[in-house]
Amino acid sequence: MIEEIELADKVGLDIYAIGEHHRKDFAVSAPEIVLAAGAVNTKNIRLSSATTNISTNDPVRVYQNFATVDAISNGRAEIMLGRGSFTESFPLFGYSLSDYEELFTEKMDMILEIRKNEILNWKGSFTQSVDGRGVYPRAVQKDFPIWVATGGNVESTLRIAEKGLPIVYAIIGGNPLNFKPLIDAYRKFGKQNGHDEKHLKVAAHSWGYIAENSEKAKKQYFHPTKSLVDQISRERAHWSEMTWEQYEYSIGPNGAMFVGNPEEVAKKIIKIIEELGLDRFMLHLPIGSIPHEDVLKSIELYGTKVAPIVREYFRNKG
């Protein structure tokens, strides 16, 4: 993973983000530790969690840890807050799922207060109360970036908009265009609550894979993706095992997966950015059992071939 971060920086990609998981089938439980290691030999790439499960973390420690990454990286760290795709962290750290909403809301508010004020005064119900204590170290960046991720829940969208925080949509199924009403509502509600439109940034995160040969990419990506989806489908009633037909739709022009050769993937990225009015697009490349050397090649193609096509298109468009 450190090699991936260093390569992503070398080929000129903008950001590398790592998720927090507490399962046998995922490698990282503490993204900030890996990001700190990735900061050492990189110069430009931004380093983010994707996501930090704030509901089952201590907001003070989350801020301190990422402020440390920000110092090591000379101001390149970001936090992406979320509830997380899985619930293992709740019993693991002694939290109840019955407090799901309250934990997320209070802890998100607490870390925003920590970002705003060096000296923390806080009365908590699901968090500790703090009376005039400093939280250190402070982030290098004056307005330390905190994004909030959601799978497309309307209430979450409006809550994030009300706070004027940048939002990240996990678009991993269906037609990405279905998210347009949510994005429009986010921007409208954010402005109604007095937030400057320039701060109401929208990002999307989707799965994908790139190879020089389109057919190779599509065939190679299927089985690792199916394996992951099928595993989740055994745990969640609203998921179903992936068929080849479903996969073909997902990698097609109206699907949510970005798989193919560099030109195909670039064209599809341009399409989603334009249709949804995105400020940032993040492609989740490594998944399941894809060999490490193939993941590195995909990152290389993303940085050297896909990204230049996308950047040139929007540069020419003005």
Residue ranges and their predicted role:
Residues M1-S48, F144:
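N-terminal beta1-alpha1-beta2 module of alpha/beta enzyme domains
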Residues I15-G38, N53, S85, I172-G174, ...:
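Glycine-rich, proline-tolerant flexible connector loops at the mouths of alpha/beta enzymes
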Residues D58-L165, L177-K180, D184, Q192:
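Internal, glycine-rich beta/alpha segment that forms the wall or movable "lid"
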Residues M1-L7, G151-L158, E264-K271:
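Short, acidic/polar
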Residues K10, E101-V135, L177-D279, R311-G318:
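An alpha-helical appendage that flanks or caps ligand/catalytic pockets
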Residues D9, L35-K43, F66, D70-R76, ...:
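Acidic (Asp/Glu)-rich catalytic clusters
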Residues L13-I15, T42-L47, I72-E78, K116-E118, ...:
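Short, well-ordered coil/turn segments that N-cap beta-strands
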Residues E20, G38, V69, I111, ...:
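Conserved, mostly hydrophobic/aromatic
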